[in-house]
Amino acid sequence: MAEGGQAQQQPPQLGPGAAARGMKRESEVELPVPGAGADGPEPGLSKRPRTEEAADGGMQNEPLTPGYHGFPARDGQGNQEPTTTPDAMVQPFTTIPFPPPPQNGIPTEYGVPHTQDYAGQTSEHNLTLYGSTQPHGEQSSNSPSNQNGSLTQTEGGAQTDGQQSQTQSSENSESKSTPKRLHVSNIPFRFRDPDLRQMFGQFGKILDVEIIFNERGSKGFGFVTFENSADADRAREKLHGTVVEGRKIEVNNATARVMTNKKMVTPYANGWKLSPVVGAVYGPELYAASSFQADVSLGNEAAVPLSGRGGINTYIPLISLPLVPGFPYPTAATTAAAFRGAHLRGRGRTVYGAVRAVPPTAIPAYPGVVYQDGFYGADLYGGYAAYRYAQPATATAATAAAAAAAAYSDGYGRVYTADPYHALAPAASYGVGAVASLYRGGYSRFAPY
């Protein structure tokens, strides 16, 4: 009975050892088997090799039925999270039907179970490739934010591009609307405004063309104003330094005009803006006649009255200073002064007629100058004509000097006869005929200086 009681108490003693079956302990290895009798060593011997085999980690050699050795059934996945493989998470093949072909770039492993979740977002995520190891919850939560971020960046970039394009367009419009003036120098003297406009018109719209002239003609430079500053810069780059009719033109940006406060001389009544000294050079007998006007103011007893037009009396003094022999002073001198085309003086004009068929109308420019009836007579007009057209070929030395004085008395011709570049004939040949020959002899009034 005692052995039977020990045999009945044996399973409770083996209970704690059986609970920790998978762990190797020294007490369990050296634990003697109770109740080892004549027929008892065989269970003990069969128990020790199985314990050592289990201690060596031979889990793969266990029988497929867990309750074969009288132990409670163990959970094969209880403490095995670190050593599990991805196959352990895969559902059995029988629970999943065959997946359809991939749609919209989604991998085949997400075809069936997630088509309902992504049914509304497949069109939005055509370009997104999902990784197989990323949870779908995180993907679905991150992808809209990423998409919104990309959209925000795209909109910001589009706004930036739009601002830049607007800025560039405004700058282009400003540059197009800003006119620019170019200074063109060393151009041919025969060039006129249409020639300069034709030369620069190929680069853009031109607002204004101006060539600077003086009384002799072109000064060899001018200005061209473009409507667009870019066209002006392009024209300056292309035309600067080019050779036009043997002259190397220069094109530069025109600087601002510098207005100097020059002291203006009081202009005369007929438009002359000359000082008395320069005026005496242009017309010496004008200022010589003023002395005779002073003689007129001496009194009636020293002069001979002449009846003029409209009852106006002009007195010719009896005292006469012989400037030119045979010339009746002062009436003819004062009338000749007014006769000398004062309405054309100071301007570049064509060849003044050598023979004045019809005298001009009276210009009330100088006091005391009144046309007389006798001026149109043969005596006075013939004397004036003889003075103007005296030919030195049949004259003596005195008349040659008079003819030279006559040439100097012409206010406009005097400039050319005194010019050493144009007066190439000897002094005896001076006269109106010589001045006219200068015009006929290829003299260009557009000479530079």
Curated annotation (Swiss-Prot):
Region (Disordered): 1-186
Disulfide bonding pattern of the chain: none
Keyword Membrane attached: no
Sites marked Interaction with RNA: 181, 189-190, 214, 219, 223, 247, 257
Cellular localisation: Nucleus; Cytoplasm
Tissue specificity: Detected in brain neurons (at protein level). Detected in heart, brain, embryo, lung, liver, kidney and ovary.
Entry-annotated residues carrying Asymmetric dimethylarginine: 356, 388, 440, 445
Name recorded for this polypeptide: RNA binding protein fox-1 homolog 2
Organism annotation: Mus musculus (Mouse)
